[in-house]
């Protein structure tokens, strides 16, 4: 499939050193909200900071209606994530209309990530909020190539008619030791161009 070739190419382009980086599969667990918040706060509530980076899809009816949402928050004392930082992401076409190629996932220079008990008796690298929040599409996989992580969607995110609240991924997230910085991430698609640059927030590294 073209989208899989794009994934491999994107990861290789971003993660190459002297030799091609080897893929390291990450553990992904499905969770619900607000239960997953308990990893970061004793009362299972978190105060978040949101930002968006617009995906420059060329044939939308209105600009700035396709975006990557970055969400950051801090781990409180007395929790598994105490002193750490949480990061969540969501790819959204909910406000978009017109036509666009289907989107396959996210390439993110995230740096080191932490394993935490996001679900009962399950320590994982990545969590996906499949209930209790926005979204209709989860993750098929998450793979690390050096400092870069490639998140492949469980199915392509496609623009179907006008604005639709179903046209978004679930929030998926990770944790790290450091506060955020802004970087350029890549959204990969089934069309041409195969990659769209988009602003995102990641741990400082």
Regions found by a protein language model. Name each.
Residues 24-205:
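Extracellular or exported targeting regions of proteins
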Residues 8-17:
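Bacterial N-terminal signal peptides
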Residues 19-23:
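Sec/Tat signal peptide C-region and signal peptidase I cleavage site
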Residues 1-8:
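Bacterial N-terminal signal peptides that target proteins for export
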């Amino acid at each position: 499939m073209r989208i899989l070739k794009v994934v491999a190419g994107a990861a290789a382009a971003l993660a190459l050193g002297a030799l091609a980086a080897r893929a390291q599969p990450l553990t992904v667990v499905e969770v619900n909200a607000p239960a997953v918040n308990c990893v970061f706060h004793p009362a299972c509530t978190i105060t978040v900071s949101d930002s968006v980076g617009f995906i420059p899809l060329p044939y939308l009816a209105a600009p700035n209606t396709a975006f990557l949402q970055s969400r950051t928050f801090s781990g409180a004392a007395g929790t598994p994530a105490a002193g750490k930082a949480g990061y969540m992401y969501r790819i959204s076409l909910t406000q978009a209309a017109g036509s666009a190629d289907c989107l396959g996932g996210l390439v993110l220079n995230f740096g080191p990530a932490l394993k935490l008990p996001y679900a009962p008796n399950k320590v994982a690298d990545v969590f996906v909020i499949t209930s209790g929040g926005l979204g209709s599409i989860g993750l098929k996989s998450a793979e690390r190539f050096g400092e870069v992580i490639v998140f492949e969607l469980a199915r392509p995110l496609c623009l179907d008619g006008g604005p639709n609240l179903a046209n978004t991924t679930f929030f998926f997230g990770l944790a790290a030791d450091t506060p955020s910085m802004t970087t350029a991430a890549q959204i990969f698609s089934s069309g041409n161009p195969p990659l769209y640059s988009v602003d995102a927030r990641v741990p400082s590294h």
